[in-house]
Amino acid sequence: MTSLEDTIIVKNKLDSVGCGFCLAKWTQVTIHLGSGLTHSCHHVKAHPIDLNELAENPGALHNTGFKKNVRKQMLNNERPNECDYCWRIEDNTGMTSDRVFKSRDPYSWSDFDTISKMTGDENFYPRYVEVSFSNVCNFKCGYCGPAFSSKWTDEIKEHGPYKFKYVNWKYNQPDESQ
């Protein structure tokens, strides 16, 4: 799916399930094993993987209680707060957000019918998986941060934290676990 018409069709189908519905919460995962964090979208803050959940269900590497609650919100026509990046784009620019682009990827869109009928409590095994074993990295990608990049940590230790106007968590503080 690449055309503007396809994008509009995808957005309309997503909105027919719920105004905040995004397939990425089911079909995509990034797992940061070194820090025990996970997320399904690079725009949201990574959250901890509960070790008690994991002991009961290895699928909790992706299907955390936190994600299941967010999925329920999406299926109940709600807009999860953690997805505000997409809401700001959709509400203030009239543009299509990553909610649509991530959902229309072939590894996501093919599961639309199945996922749209779920309750949010089910385990769903992702089609797109990224695994990070530590924060050792030779790059300082702007969307990453020191928790996931040793080069970011080194730069912040040398020059101090970045001053971001709209970031309100300790995103750019050095990773003290090193």
Question: Residue locations for each model-derived region?
Answer:
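Conserved alpha-helical substructure of the radical SAM core
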Residues: 89-178
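Accessory C-terminal segments flanking Radical SAM cores
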Residues: 3-106, 125
